[in-house]
Amino acid sequence: KKSGVLGRQFMINIIANLNLASPDTNYNLDGQANLTAQQTFDLYHNSIGVKIDKAYNQLMNELGYAGLEKAIKENKGIDKARLTFLQNLRGIISQEATERELPENYMQALTIEKDNQGNWQFMMPLSFPNYKRKFESIIMGILKKRVIRQNVNGGSAKQIAELGGHITSQDAGLTELKFVRYEDGRIKKAEVAIRADIAAQYGFKPGDDLSQIPEELRTIIGYRIPNQSKNSDIPLVIKYVLPDNYDQAIVVPGGITTQQGSDFDIDTLYLLMPHTKLNEETGRPEKVKVPYDKLFDENGKLDMQELNKLTPKEVDNILVDVSEAILTSPVHFKEVVTP
């Protein structure tokens, strides 16, 4: 999949054990900003809040509820706005009712008509006892799907641990996939080979020399469900692109089996990937950048106004950048690699 649900357990565990009292700037975001644990926590927590708010506002706009609220506030165009809202609500409920194969009388109950005061309404109130539970279930399901469950760029892939006995060649760039390690004074990401359809999002194809492509475009955050702690998460960098016949697969270094407690059935690795855009001058994809220099004031406090100005793709990339910063921080290295 090219998108997937942001795991609830992952969201909780990724910011666990941050020393919020420490003044040390242990977290480097996208090579732009060095943050303290408190700043990192605030940015991550509020970014998820902004993401949820944007999803909620989008749904309310699609339903016409935001327009109805505005009409009531201005005391103008209320009748038209109410009709639009009921039509949109009926449409979205109808779609869910069809998928659930509900009887036709549920749709008949949503016939829109005027009451004795001339106001638009459903033929039967949504709270009518015979229909209440089904309609409540549908509406809550819509909110859960569109607002509570947050989607991110990435998706999932079936992990295959790399086995020994294959050909390696330093000259050709063919080497074994390396696990997370401390090297040259910093934490290096684990190397993976990904399937062609995911690679295509970034303009990669089988056989490409990825060593010439910026690491920020090849960075992925992987995590498993159930997610018990940071040893269920791993920072990854794409080293190879698999042939087209590797459907839904990601090849990982053997060390991940011990780290995450994967067993020998088919385990799924869930992926967080940065959003990209096409550079019109070069014709190549590049990472959507977050203006971190604008997100904190001179006192180091998060500026919520600036955070709310960001696009959904920029907010998503904050989640990727924060996750990468935490998982590659020496402070959490032991948590990541210890089974």
Can you say where each PLM-predicted feature lies in the sequence?
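Core catalytic machinery and nucleic-acid-binding channels of phosphodiester-processing enzymes
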Residues: 1-339
